[in-house]
Amino acid sequence: KLGIPIIYSPIRGVHKRMLKDLRRYTKFYSVFDWAPHSNWASKLFVKRMNKVGIKTSKMTNPTTLELAKIVVDTSYYGWLINYAQISQMIASKHEVDYDEMWSFASEIHKFLGNRPKLFPGFIGGHCVIPNLDLIHDKTLDEIKKMNSLYSRKIKK
């Protein structure tokens, strides 16, 4: 056990525009309540973030925030890209235009907001796939498998 509070606050944003994204997104943070001086640390963190124009939001504990980052952010994004990969492979198999096929959902997304079109491509980088290894979930591991399958199919 440490004698000082540790604040956990994952990064949100895209690396090539990180400074802009750090200011754009709310800075979620958490510290265990049992940590010494956790209230003081939280207040100081919020004060410093607000001083540079960054909004903050505290989650109840670091575990919730870590799962939010991995499950709700990067893994969800991976699933969406996987669906784009699958739909592109199906379109290619049937020799139809991917964008034309997806135009069918444009109006639905406009009115309902629940049919976003993502663009297929190999999931690289150092967020989505590496974060899957932190969660140890067989279902989420399917993202890696589909990404590998997509890579092999596209190279043909």
What are these regions (language model features)?
Residues 2-113, 141, 145-146:
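Internal alpha-helical scaffold of NAD(P)-dependent oxidoreductase catalytic cores
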Residues 97-155:
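C-terminal substrate-binding/catalytic lobe of Rossmann-fold NAD(P)-dependent oxidoreductases
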